Amino acid sequence: MMILVTGGARSGKSRHAEALIGDAPQVLYIATSQILDDEMAARIQHHKDGRPAHWRTAECWRHLDTLITADLAPDDAILLECITTMVTNLLFALGGENDPEQWDYAAMERAIDDEIQILIAACQRCPAKVVLVTNEVGMGIVPENRLARHFRDIAGRVNQRLAAAADEVWLVVSGIGVKIK
């Protein structure tokens, strides 16, 4: 079962996603963040400290089909957090050292879509419950710079693809989860 949990920043998405995992005997938490500064390190540690001790953590943001496999048991669970961070990492990996003003966003989106299609296929083959957390980025103002606009657009389309493929979709607002699919 593939479940998508979306919402704004600090909306309670993580807590809601963790509740959806329930009491699965084996949980793999896939963290897509990269530790780039002390603040991010502290945020990641805060999340780790709040998880049950038996949860395993894998830090990975690419080739997720190597972790989400058909070998898992049906009562196991995977929590992947977060899709928008994965999209950010992919954008910057694809852009390399080039100026973001010169990036070919259409080609980058195709490459990101390929990665998302592989992720969806892995989730659909996996017998375990897979909960994906993402940020709802399309409810705010139009960003003023090109990179931010393209990120918002790409992340929004990624979320649409994931929602279409998911068995359930939850929107979390102010700590309250609303099932929308």
UniProtKB/Swiss-Prot annotation:
Family of this protein: Belongs to the CobU/CobP family.
Subunit structure: Homotrimer.
Active site: H47
Recorded effect of pH on activity: Optimum pH is 8.8-9.0.
Binding site for GTP: 7-14, 31-33, 48-51, 59, 81
Domain of life, per lineage: Bacteria
GO biological process annotation, one example: cobalamin biosynthetic process
One Pfam family recorded for the sequence: CobU
Keyword Nucleotide-binding assigned: yes
Pathway as given in its UniProt record: Cofactor biosynthesis; adenosylcobalamin biosynthesis; adenosylcobalamin from cob(II)yrinate a,c-diamide: step 5/7; Cofactor biosynthesis; adenosylcobalamin biosynthesis; adenosylcobalamin from cob(II)yrinate a,c-diamide: step 6/7
Signal peptide range: none
GO MF term (any one): adenosylcobinamide kinase activity
Temperature optimum or stability note: Optimum temperature is 37 degrees Celsius.
EC number: 2.7.1.156, 2.7.7.62
Keywords for this protein: ATP-binding, Cobalamin biosynthesis, GTP-binding, Kinase, Nucleotide-binding, Transferase
Source organism (scientific name): Salmonella typhimurium (strain LT2 / SGSC1412 / ATCC 700720)
Catalytic activity annotation: adenosylcob(III)inamide + GTP = adenosylcob(III)inamide phosphate + GDP + H(+); adenosylcob(III)inamide + ATP = adenosylcob(III)inamide phosphate + ADP + H(+); adenosylcob(III)inamide phosphate + GTP + H(+) = adenosylcob(III)inamide-GDP + diphosphate
Originating gene: cobU
Name of the molecule in the record: Bifunctional adenosylcobalamin biosynthesis protein CobU
Keyword Manganese part of the UniProt annotation: no
Free-text function comment from the UniProt entry: Catalyzes ATP-dependent phosphorylation of adenosylcobinamide and addition of GMP to adenosylcobinamide phosphate.
